[in-house]
């Protein structure tokens, strides 16, 4: 089927063994309309703009393609991977045959290693933020992550450029390094919630952080000995250049 959709990225052509219902129309050797409600087994997923493929065990898909309206729409996509990861998404591509197509959609994942998200992060999207996250965080897993996006896709180069990205997530087991300024050392294992909105050009519009910290250590400038941080909570909202601290609680054991 993918061979008849001439603008479909090569990364989406390894769809696996297919069963279900397909309805299609052909004209002059070209696919003009397609409606599908299918199940795929043992296939490969590749997302445009992300240079990694992932093998999946099963996938339930409901999608449609229309050459007259120049659109490709995914109403449902639910994939299960061998390592218990789950991924679902929906969305639409309009101006499908144009040099630059419009893309809008939502991706939701469970049990996703944070490193895999960083490895697949598109380079043009908030590159400075990606570098900061790599430097300050390691390990851990997203229990839940949801991203809503709007952007443009260039089939010729498989380049995906996002003009809007909204992120919601819950995670655990991340080792974090918050050292900065008077805090010569501030490390802890963190979990909690992180949300953000990123606009055109990778501009971060707002960030919501709601964290719990354990097994931490802090060393202030001018002090010789670090202080253990047994437990901590912090909730903060950042909008533009303004940061609002809504809650901060630290348990330093015998140190206070």
Residue ranges of predicted features:
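Short, P/G- and charge-enriched loop/turn segments at secondary-structure junctions
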Residues: 9, 131-135
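Outer membrane beta-barrel transmembrane domains
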Residues: 126-127
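Short loop/turn motifs that connect adjacent beta-strands in outer-membrane beta-barrel proteins
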Residues: 156-162
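Hydrophobic lipid-interacting interfaces of membrane-associated proteins
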Residues: 1-6, 13-29, 36-101, 106-119, ...
């Amino acid at each position: 089927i993918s061979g008849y959709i001439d603008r479909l990225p090569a990364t989406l052509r390894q769809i696996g063994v297919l069963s279900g219902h397909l309805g299609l129309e052909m004209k002059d050797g070209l696919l003009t309309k397609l409606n599908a409600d299918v199940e795929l087994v043992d296939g490969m997923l590749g997302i445009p703009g992300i240079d990694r493929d992932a093998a999946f065990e099963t996938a339930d898909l409901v999608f449609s393609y229309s050459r007259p309206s120049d659109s490709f729409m995914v109403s449902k996509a639910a994939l299960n991977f061998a390592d218990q990861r789950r991924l679902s998404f929906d969305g639409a591509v309009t101006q499908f045959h144009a040099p630059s197509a419009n893309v809008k959609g939502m991706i939701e994942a469970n049990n996703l290693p944070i490193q895999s998200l960083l490895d697949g992060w598109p380079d043009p999207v908030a590159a400075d933020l990606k570098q900061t996250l790599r430097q300050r965080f390691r390990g851990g897993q997203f229990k839940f992550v949801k991203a809503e996006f709007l952007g443009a896709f260039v089939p010729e180069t498989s380049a995906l450029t996002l003009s809007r990205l909204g992120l919601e997530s819950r995670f655990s087991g991340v080792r974090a390094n918050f050292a900065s300024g008077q805090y010569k050392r501030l490390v802890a294992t963190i979990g909690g919630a992180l949300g953000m909105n990123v606009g055109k050009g990778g501009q971060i519009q707002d960030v919501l952080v709601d964290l719990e910290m354990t097994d931490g250590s802090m060393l202030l400038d001018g002090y010789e000995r670090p202080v253990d941080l047994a437990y901590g909570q912090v909730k903060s909202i950042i909008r533009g250049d303004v940061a609002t601290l809504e809650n901060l609680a630290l348990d330093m054991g015998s140190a206070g």
